[in-house]
Amino acid sequence: MNISKKALSLIRYNLQGSLKKNGINIWRYVFKGVEKGTGVERLFFIELIVLNPYLSPSDIVLGFDSRVSVSSEQLQNVLAGTVSAQKMMSETLVVPSYICVKAGILGAGARQLCFYAPVKDVKSSLKSFYFEVGRCSFSEERLSGLISQNPSDIQEHPGFLSDTGLISWDLRYEIRLDSTVGFSGKSANWFPVGINTVFAGNISIDGREYSVLPKNSFGYFDRIFGPSCPDNLFHLSSSHLTSVITGKLLEKSSFAVHGVYKDKVSIVAILEDKKIEFAADLSKRAYKSIYDCSTITDSVDGDKLHWTISASNKQYIVDIDVFCIASDLFVRTLELPNGKRKVIKFVSGKSSSGEIRMYKNNRSNLELIEHAHLADCLCEFGSLEVPEE
């Protein structure tokens, strides 16, 4: 894998110290597959999530579960008849602890399958990035796995937040463009380490088989880790860009937007030989960013969600517009390390259309560097959800 040493260290990074019992660690892969026989194209995702792994190393603990806390003294009072059992019973919210693999499909008919395990069931390496859990394995060059959930499994464990069915994959990947600029903070970190990643292999879901081809996989790989995640989620990323100016596919181009950090989003945009990085961990004066996600009504497609970003410093301006059909968006949930049933609830989908423009600020005028159409863009938007007491 021909990437920088810093990017490789970020890929290999695992939770250390107190984060083993109070932290989240995510490896996320996104790529396109083409259905065999029909040629239908779909956007897939695979995620490895490590959440408070050593808080409960031998058992899976879901934060959606609750446990009844009963002391021996309370139990004696119930037996003596001085306190009713109903009055004594009180719920104690638990803190989650598990390893989870999520894999699914985005866009129309979106769905995901999830597999959970305790950290004791994981095989891993300290010398390189390697995780093996259940029938899934992750390494620096390959992804393989199989997840199967039947209706009785989900009925017994609704907290799995998984659809029923079967998904399997066998993929190799290579990072073509890496980025070690993103956001680094005490509470959260994000890096688009494989901002342009090529995938090759096969993936199937419920009997439908898809080929993943290097020339049009348009892949993306990022890392999220730390004691927590931002309360508000705003994400866009794509490596499928076509120049409006020349009409050519921009093979050495990608972009990623992620936040919200300190009321800003971090932006990394690589358009052929131009690279712009706006990191939210820089000083407030380093750049300005305006972002929004709103609903609009289209006469053809109905309601759409519209992501907009405009960011600038003294040298460059980047404007991004992305649209998703609202009915194709998939509601997902990410548990947070601190428990108390706190989650990030967000919509996730594949873009229906989008554009990116990059300008150079020449003081007296703006020079258009590139204007490109976006496709196969991962789009996410959501916020912290806290249960009512």
What are these regions (language model features)?
Residues 1-389:
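Structured soluble/peripheral alpha/beta segments that form catalytic or ligand/cofactor-binding pockets
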